[in-house]
Amino acid sequence: MSRGPGSPLSFLLTGWAWLLLTALVGLATFLGVVRGSPLPPGLRMLHVHGALVGGMLQLLTGLALAALELVGHETKRPGHLGLFIGLNLAALGLASGSWLRDSNLILIGGLFLLLSLLPMSRHMVQALRTCPGWTPLAALFLGISLTGLFGTVVLGGFLAGAWFPTWHGMLRLGHLHAGLLLFLTMGMVGTIQLALPPLLNRPLRSTGAGQIVLLLLPSGAAGLLTGFMLSSVHIQLTAGICLLVTLALCVWNLLSTWSQAGQPGSVATDHLLTALFFLLIMEVTGMAVGLNVLWTPPLMPYGTLHLVAYTHTAFIGFLLQAIVGGLAYAVPRLLAVRRVTSQKKRPAYREQLEHIMDRWRAIQVSCLSFGTLGLVLVPSLTWNFPLTSSWVHTAVWTSVGLLLSSLTLLTMKIAQAVGTHPTGERAARN
């Protein structure tokens, strides 16, 4: 088992560090908008690319490698140092290039990311194939999702190079939604549906409903992309209804599976189930945004803060909650496998680490959830109060405080888990 840079744990810890640092940048830009003194726009793009590539994409890669290691597929393989370096160079190039508005840096970062896609995709597919619910339809579903990742990188390169200025708006829409809708959102839904039942030690409540979700979700996503490309709100709303019904079916199926498993509770399951709740909020909010623009002028004013609220319902409420759930599940098991060679002694050490990760889980999940809801509340308040209102500023600082509290708490628990070694005889695996 590999140790150091290139190991699954290194992907997870480095990805979490990227996410923390870029989250601070994002909160600073949000506060700047609310206070009427926006920070340079380059910082916003640094936040976006750093969080998505250095943070979320690296964490997803780490979770895939962790899954392979935990089922014994990676015990005799060397570390993934090349992928680790390439992914972090890609994040650094994209983030710094976005901040400095340097297209050459962005293109270099995009090239590193493009070169990392093949090994990254292979590990993700191999990891999900270990799930009992893997089917040919799941393989097709994941292939479509990974195509979205490839597409967003290629379209991002076209944008950075400014090679097709006439198509800039269309390319930008494709770049955004191929990555966010096809890869992150759709891929995460499929991953949760495949991974949650084994975590609960229970088969999926309805296999047929699960297959319907895998079939309809790409169709709804394709319809939504078509609506965006054609600037047709009616197509967007029709596709949105399809997505809402499909996602509701997925959530019902997973919640029923959890209920049949005896409603087990851990910080991992808490975050994953909360992510499902925000998944529905995200879709309903998107439908409301689409309905709002049917009026001319829009029925309710819609500006930068409202866009931030909508997108971060997805980023923090759904994606981050799900990734944190995976992180809380993987870290104790990785450390136990890495540090204890004895099969008899390993469970006791793993339970000790799980106890650390489960501490104050209600506070951790609640702070992250209510902090996200607070971001939605802030722009809603601007419909009735000015930005200078004490109501708005109170909601802003409360939301920021809750989010920072949750992130800080999780970081402290990860640090404590990494720093807790097994008592007695132990051996580190190389």
Residue spans of the language-model regions?
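Hydrophobic alpha-helical transmembrane segments of multi-pass integral membrane proteins
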Residues: M1-N430
